[in-house]
Amino acid sequence: MSEHDDTNETRVDAQVAALVTEAQDQLRPTAVPARREALDRDEHLIKDAVLRMGSLVEEAIRDASRALQTHDQELALRVITGDAVINEAQRSVTRLISVTIATQSPVARDLRYLLTLDHVMYELERIGDHASSVAKQVLKLAPEPPLRDYIHLPAMAEQGAVLVHGVLRALVDIDAVAAREIAVLDDEIDRMYHETFDEVVALMRADPANVERGTRCIIASHYLERIGDRATNIAEDIVYLVTGDVE
């Protein structure tokens, strides 16, 4: 072997050694806790933001319910304008989740957790939209005498707020058992929706003067029923987070 070959071999060995050292540095135990700490911090920030948004949504439902019962048009307007805040919160947290996934490269349970929170945000935003839609019907119903006190609409709204509060509590506790109970509560909203629909249609048939108010009531009841369905979707997300099972 020539002196030139020896020099080349030495150079290659040095390069290989440098690459090995660099790889070992990247795999040192200190790097893992640092990444874990950053991911934990981001997950904590995201979860807090989701819960804050959930509180806004729950408040919107309760305010829509009060506006419905008291014919409070000003309160209904606040629910409608407040929906923009909920929408912006959803967009902000979605961006944060995307950045966290891109920069932290979460896997397994962490990735499932972030994707679950992203879908929870989507469902909460839609619930906020439904609360706003109920408030818009309140603006049209408020000037007129209530049609049989709107049948079950106030109770449906209150039950919807209870469901949202319940799924947020289950999310905080990561509690699949509590999440599964939400579906049972949603059945009650479904029952009230069908009873309201049937009774309002009967009132509309009995007196054509009830048609416009009755139509508004049916529209509002539809949105309230959807609130229950979306709360159930969040509950199913929590079950998936805990068990990995899709229900």
Predicted regions and their residues:
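Cytosolic, long alpha-helical scaffolding segments
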Residues: M1-E247
